[in-house]
């Protein structure tokens, strides 16, 4: 239940909305006076968006999802607007992904770069002392949840709001952020879980970084080999499914 609640609310990034729709469009140079002054609560992908939220459609691979979206507005091109239900109004642009990224940055300005978590504490200052086995120099952020019978290795950092289930082992020199980890998961030495993915768009004379506001969800009975990296999702999540075993030095990209 806790994992499901966190997946619905995303505790890792603060939504600064709602915003007036025309304000958002003006900020990305896509002003349209024919659109309403409706307040937009959030930006999400097609299958998770709800009423009073904005989504995007940029590829024919997602037209089936578009037909069922509950979003009120969708950034898309002329080629795909016919796939949207009557309840979802198309906002036409030839730069769907760039404009999606720019609006995401407005809602989640802290998602562009991975700042250091200034809430991390030595384990002696946390509730886990005596309940979880820790190596030396382990740091734990605010509101971290760790289940029973877990082990955290030397020099590892578990950043704020991360959830780790029962019977898990985290190796030495591991960094975990923006992640929900279920039961019986083994993450070996040197892994980095939940950092921002590699996403950007060329924009005039520079590159625009795509905000990464998704998470990493690691399901039951997973092992992740030494030195592996798993990037969090952009608008959706990166999911490592049940009973997955990854070898050493594997990179799993965002989404």
Protein language model annotation of sequence segments:
Residues 1-124, 184, 190-191, 195-209, ...:
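Terminal amphipathic alpha-helical/low-complexity segments used for targeting or macromolecular assembly
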Residues 56, 120-255:
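Structural signal for interior beta-strand "rungs" in well-ordered beta-sheet cores
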